[in-house]
Amino acid sequence: VTLCTIGDYIAMKLCGRQTPVIDASNAAGLGFFDAEKRTFNQTVLRGIGIDPAFLPGLTEDRFIGICRSRARVAAAIGDNQAGFLSAVRDREHEMLVNVGTGSQFSVFSSRCMTVPGLETRPMPGGGWLLAGAALCGGRAYALLADFFTQTARMMGMDMNAPYAAMEGLLKSAGRPEDVPTVLPLFEGTRQDSMQTGSTAENFTPLHLIYGMMDGMAHELHQMYQAYRAAGGTAKKLIGSGGGLRNNRFLCESFSRAFDSEITLSDGREEAACGAALYAAD
């Protein structure tokens, strides 16, 4: 019996292998993995009673076999890494912020770095991806929309399109000079689950919308600051995910927080696209 991820299992079945193999970018997600050495920590595994043979064998090869149609089958790779491969064209000079239901900051490094608040994940083909994920992320904006909906209902009004109403207010009113500080930590942080969201003064819908967007951008910018403090270099800012693609005002908040123009990635479904690009090379 061997453990593997669903991606490894599908790849194994496609090319008729009897046992699965795993890329380091996928293996790291199983735990007990030394990202710098790109191997499972067998000492730790044995120390807790797990036979290292229970885990799949690591492969450095891009292709692991051939399917019935004679097409080559690539090893499955990590979804974060796949999304980065699709969204970022120049990994040495670009970094990525993604806002969907959650949010994430990712930046490539040719050397293995340890950065507080960021995970060091192996990249397919070499190098590492430093990644930080907010627990709430893009859902903070959804919580704000739900707050406005509940407030309208409390006042006896129906609001079926809160996002359209919020966008209309942003378009018509402009950005106030006294936007409040908002911490959108409604589910805590990965370091402290007891931290919760908070706001300062200037409590109007317009101020709160801008404050929430600024807070979402600030949370990922803190990860970038930790990366720079650890010796990382400045890079061009790339954005992906529906949260950014569908909200130019949120893009402006990220540009303001990072003090950099943000460029949206070319396509959608970045993780699926990145996996295809990896297999096509």
Regions inferred by a protein language model and the residue ranges of each:
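Nucleotide/phosphate-binding loop and acidic/charged catalytic motifs
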Residues: 21-27
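Active-site core segments that coordinate phosphate-bearing ligands/cofactors
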Residues: 1-19, 31-42, 46-47, 64, ...
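Gly/charged, well-structured mid-domain segments that form the phosphate/adenylate-handling core
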Residues: 57-64
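A structural motif corresponding to the C-terminal end of an alpha-helix
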Residues: 47-54
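Short, conserved phosphate-binding/catalytic loop or strand-edge motifs used
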Residues: 27-28, 62
